[in-house]
Regions:
Chain B
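Glycine-rich, small/acidic residue-mixed loop/short-helix segments
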Residues: 24-34, 39-41, 231-252, 256-261, ...
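Intrinsically disordered, low-complexity linkers and terminal tails enriched in Pro/Gly
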Residues: 194-200, 276-283
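Secondary-structure boundary elements
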Residues: 80-84, 89, 96-166, 174-176, ...
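Linear, non-domain "peripheral" regions
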Residues: 1-119, 125
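Short capping/connector residues at structural and topological boundaries
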Residues: 18, 70, 106-107, 165-166, ...
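Hydrophobic/aromatic-rich core segments of domains that either
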Residues: 170-260
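Conserved structured core elements
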Residues: 3, 168-169
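N-terminal start-of-chain detector that recognizes signal peptides
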Residues: 11-15, 44-51, 158, 185-189, ...
Length: 471, 283, 316
């Protein structure tokens, strides 16, 4: 594997300018002080109950995501490039989804193959020909970014359904402010705490009708959902009700919530519930988590769902490989942020290449997420590769492959002190009817194990505070 | 032919239920083979009925039963004028290109057994229409049509094949699943079947009743063609088409978060003697 | 506010209050069980603990006849048993689950108390506790409810969320006091008066202790412990925070606050006020004359009815 780019130290041992102050500070603070602060951070996290559940793990129903106290630093210029590219990407995603559910120009022009849409489980026939309020579909996007050298940021993945992690972005900053006020006095760090206001403004701008103050609610699957903490955290930050399906009902195509003062109309639902569970009259009929009749209110234009139903048609890994073409098709622009080169195993010549190069590639399931069901060639032994090969051959259309990127590393506190670990970045892009809002930075995820490239929290990844320097 | 139809559904709820949302898909649309002369929906509950179109262009009504109540009863009743088009459909409401109907669903999953069955019926030459007929014949020989709940919860394609017998809905699942595997768009149809011989109709189809599921498949040059593999024939003037979707779940005449459902369905030749083909099903 | 949120708050405070009451019952039973029989100690103190907690059927199904109830069984059943839906452990579990569901309606201080208590609960061993450990455990439970009440009182906005939370606690508290009286009413009855020996004193004192009112009794009545005064303190005395009258004074006020905030009142306000009036207008002689037992049974049933009315009116 090629040598990874470290965001703090250049190969010649010099420190990159943005990290100079941090590096000096790290060198000056004794290890035991850092250890102590790290323990303090963990204590605070547990105390306020920021936990998540790991699927398939018994007795570990509530676990902490490791928090790394060394911040990641991004310069103002780097952020400028990133945010323009993110805005472009999300704009194209929205236009693509709107098109797929209406005129299908993109299919007629042959930019995206028809079966990738129609045979896609995330495509919702129910959304066909339905206008959504303000023609926007992806109001809250999380775009995963990786970096390989000083100048190259790749988009690794688009999350257009219900991206999570923003609560960590906000809590990480709060904890850093509490534990290391001196560090903030040495840097000009762009604040992130406006996210709550931005999100509320975005959601309100999406209400189907003008006139009255829109009633916004967050719909959660409930306390057993792995991201429940985030749901309640956001409700708190926004000052809106956190509802479950049973708190809502639909009458004459209008959604109401049950309150102590009787039914109250709901205009915008930020739902953290998958499409399949939203409405048992339309989707899975065994869903206890949804609201019977919700889709009829949605189709009647009386409620906004964020994100819209059916956005998954834009964010699976097979569609991902077409994103550069999609951007060109709708915007007539070159993508500002490149894609990672991707082989689609559904195409025979791609599959052939992938099968011949398995030990050096990363192979992912088209609909997988959370780092499950993937093969990291260079990190796997022969038996694992052969086992995966069998899976791949049995159902090639279900996989894509990418070169194993040398993800950039950042200084990270590990047992033996500070050492480089691989990171990625998930910025959150809010698209309202009035404008696009992006809080500087995002959630940096870090693979805590030496050499590991898998940053997902379900696979033992941790998080860091992400600093965008204002000067 | 003029066919009179009556379809009654009783949906049970937990006693004392309030604000129960219900969707009914009980209003047929006209096309070249059928013309809706009159059609009414009648509920035992006061609510606003506004028609919406679902994804596939079916007319449906979603409403809310205020309650408190323990049941809802819906009666759809009407009269339809039909004519024979040798199974070829014209003038139907189409919201998607045919290729959408290659989509798999849980009920029409191409399991290895379904794939093997479809491959067994594969023709060597490129003849979509011949292929569909061959598939119908193979299916008719493999799966025996069973009397029983036509509108209840039909078996999946795989389960119908495993059991070797299924009601019309299960047979339609297997037909669509196999056709899709062979690259031919296919879809699930719900509707009504009037007795062919008004004198004998009742005796011949005792228990199967007037509610029926079948399939439509797409053959280039012809368009959509109806296939009733259970009876080994293409649609005739005795068929009234109610709804179209990817599987039985999509054409369900009533959906709610309630308990069990009871149905009574009758269709009869309204010019001939008043003989009913009547079905009762429960699920 | 969301009905479900109000419901969760209401039950959250009920469960914390119930845990507190169970801890007091166990405390008093333990104390009485050390006391020699001649001084009012009795062999069936543990049985009456089960009766007071209102889980007789479940207990008997598990451990056999109530008369033979053994200390270790009762302690483990009331304090820790996962099978007993109202064990202290389960009360805390449910309270925390409810708290998680309504975190946005709680202040961080309230959440902190519940969450910390739940974490600390895991540190108590899953075996029979020594007497020392049990005392520490009971002290921890009582302290948790104190901290929770304190956090509620000091940090919550005075709005409908607060009133629902307080209503739950008051309703539960009234129920608990009434149950203690219901199980022990016989030692308060006049027929026993002539005994007047040390045996009765310890029984009366233990009733007062179970509601933390032994000291208060002396301040209020400046008299030796007498059964009708014990009953008066627990039923009618509005100075005594655990008395039925005090609970209903608070409860009626909370429900009225809700009604005036919403601009609408209903059956729960009417029932609460009528019960409050009943407690204000009676004297203790009156109650004894008409039958203490009947009075208490009727109270418990009306109190339950009020719970049902609140649920119907606001929480569903």
């Amino acid at each position: 594997m090629p040598h990874a780019f470290d965001e703090m130290s250049s190969t010649d041992g010099s420190v990159r300018p943005a990290y100079e102050t941090l590096q000096r500070w790290l060198a000056s603070v004794p290890q035991d002080v850092l250890d102590h602060r790290r323990k303090e951070a963990e204590f605070i996290f547990r105390r306020i109950g920021i936990t998540f559940a790991v699927y398939g793990e018994q007795n570990a129903q509530e676990r902490l995501i490791p928090f790394d106290i060394v911040p990641r630093i991004i310069t103002k210029d780097e952020w400028g490039t990133l945010s323009k590219g993110l805005e472009q990407r999300v704009k194209a995603l929205n236009m693509y989804i709107a098109d797929v559910y209406a005129k299908r120009e993109v299919l007629k022009a042959g930019v995206v193959p028809e079966n990738l849409v129609y045979q896609n489980p995330a495509f919702r026939p129910e959304m066909n020909g339905q206008r959504v309020p303000h023609d926007l579909y992806v109001h809250i996007a999380g775009i995963d970014i990786v970096r390989t050298d000083p100048d190259t940021f790749y988009v690794l993945e688009d999350n257009a359904r219900t991206p999570s992690g923003v609560s960590y972005m906000l809590e990480n900053r709060e904890i850093m402010l509490r534990l290391f006020p001196e560090l903030f006095s040495m840097h000009k760090v762009a604040p992130v705490d406006k996210y709550g206001d931005d999100l509320l403004a975005t959601l309100r701008s999406l209400a189907p009708h003008g006139g009255h103050e829109p009633n916004v609610a967050i719909l959660t699957p409930g306390i057993y959902n792995s991201a429940y903490y985030e749901h309640s955290f956001l409700a708190d930050k926004l000052g809106v009700d956190l509802v479950e399906g049973r708190d809502l009902f639909v009458k004459d195509a209008v959604v109401y919530m049950r309150t102590t003062e009787g039914p109250k109309r709901v205009d915008v639902i930020y739902r953290r519930l998958d499409d399949d569970f939203l409405d048992p009259l339309v989707f899975r009929r065994d869903s206890q988590l949804g609201v019977p009749g919700l889709m009829s209110a949605y189709h009647a234009g009386n409620v906004t769902l964020t994100n819209a139903v059916g956005t998954g048609v834009a964010d699976d890994k097979a569609v991902y490989s077409y994103m550069p073409d999609i951007i060109r098709f709708y915007l007539g622009e070159e993508p500002l942020l490149p894609n990672v080169p991707t082989w689609r195993c559904r195409e025979p010549d791609h599959l052939k290449y992938v099968l011949e190069h398995l030990p050096e590639l990363v192979v992912k399931e088209v609909h997988g997420s959370g780092g499950y069901g993937m093969l990291v060639g260079p990190a796997s032994d022969k038996a694992q590769i052969e086992k995966f090969r069998a899976k791949l051959v049995a159902d090639p259309a279900n996989f894509i492959a990418q070169p194993t990127l040398a993800l950039s590393t950042c200084p990270t506190m590990v047992e033996k002190g500070v050492a480089p670990r691989h990171v990625d970045l998930r910025p959150f892009i809010l698209s309202g009817s009035d404008k696009v809002r992006i809080v500087p930075g995002g959630l940096t995820r870090v693979a805590m194990k030496e050499g590991s490239l898998v940053v997902n929290s379900s696979q033992g990844g941790g998080t860091k505070d992400t600093w965008v320097l204002d000067a | 032919m003029r066919i009179r139809i009556r379809h009654e559904i009783t949906q049970r709820f937990d006693p004392g239920s309030r604000n129960m949302a219900v969707t009914v898909r009980l209003t047929p649309r006209s096309h070249e083979g059928q013309f809706i002369l009159r059609w009414t929906l009648d509920l035992n509950s006061d609510c606003r009925l506004a028609a919406q179109e679902d994804a596939f262009g079916n007319l449906c009504h979603t409403f809310s039963v205020d309650g408190p109540t323990d049941h809802l009863s819906v009666v759809a009743e009407g009269e339809v004028e039909t004519q024979d088009t040798t199974g070829v459909m014209h003038g139907t409401v189409e919201r998607f290109p045919p290729s959408l109907f290659l989509r798999q669903t849980d009920l029409t999953e191409a399991t290895p057994a379904v794939v093997a069955f479809a491959e067994g019926a594969r023709l060597t030459e490129d003849d979509p229409l011949g292929q569909l007929h061959a598939l119908m014949v193979a299916l008719h020989e493999t799966v025996e049509e069973q009397e029983g709940p036509a509108l209840g919860g039909p078996l999946s394609a795989h389960a119908a094949l495993e059991a070797g017998k299924a009601c019309s809905g299960g047979i339609a699942h297997l037909f669509t699943a196999a056709a899709r595997h062979l690259g031919l768009p296919a879809r699930h149809i719900s509707g009504y079947l009037a007795p062919e011989d008004p004198e004998e109709g009742e005796a011949k189809r005792e228990g199967v009743g007037a509610a029926r599921h079948w399939a439509e498949a797409y053959a280039p040059k012809y368009g959509w063609i109806s296939f009733d593999a259970g009876r080994n024939l293409c649609g005739t003037e005795h068929y009234v088409r109610l709804a179209v979707a990817l599987d039985a779940m999509g054409v369900a005449p009533l959906r709610s978060a309630g308990l069990e459902v009871e149905e009574q369905v009758s269709a009869l030749d309204s010019r001939g003697p008043q003989k009913l083909a009547q079905a009762q099903s429960q699920n | 506010m969301l009905s479900r949120t109000a419901d969760n708050l209401y039950w959250l405070t009920r469960y914390v209050e119930r845990a507190d009451c169970l801890a007091r019952i166990l405390d008093v039973s333990q104390r009485l069980s050390y006391t020699p029989v001649t001084y009012g100690g009795s062999t069936n103190e543990w049985a009456s603990a089960v009766l007071t907690a209102g889980c007789e059927d479940e207990f008997v199904a598990r451990y056999g006849p109530l008369e033979d109830a053994k200390e270790e069984d009762v302690v483990s059943f009331l304090a820790f048993s996962p099978e007993n839906s109202s064990s202290i452990r389960n009360c805390f579990e449910v309270a925390r689950t409810n708290a998680r569901s309504v975190r946005t309606a709680l202040t961080s201080e309230m959440w902190d108390v519940i969450n910390s208590a739940w974490i600390e609960l895991q540190s108590f061993p899953n075996r029979a506790l020594t007497r020392d450990e049990l005392s520490r455990f009971l002290a921890f439970v009582k302290e948790t409810s104190l901290r929770f009440d304190g956090a509620t009182f000091r940090t919550m906005l005075r709005n409908d969320a607060y009133w629902f939370a307080r209503s739950g606690a008051q309703l539960e508290r009234a129920d608990n006091t009434a149950r203690i009286l219901d199980v022990k009413y016989h030692v308060l009855l006049p027929e026993k008066e002539h005994v007047g020996g040390p045996l009765d004193y310890f029984q009366w004192a233990s009733i007062l202790r179970s509601v933390s009112a032994l000291t208060a009794f002396h301040w209020v009545y400046r008299d030796s412990v007498k059964p009708w005064l014990v009953a008066d303190l627990l039923i009618l005395n509005r100075q005594m925070p655990r008395s039925l009258a005090a609970c209903y004074e608070q409860l009626a006020r909370n429900l009225d606050d809700i009604a005036s905030a919403y601009g609408r009142q209903g059956p729960s306000q009417r029932l609460a006020r009528s019960m409050q009036a009943r407690l204000t207008n009676r004297t203790i002689d009156d109650i004894f004359q008409h039958g203490l037992h009947e009075f208490i049974s009727e109270f418990i049933s009306d109190n339950n009815k009020l719970g049902a009315e609140i649920t119907e009116q606001y929480l569903t």
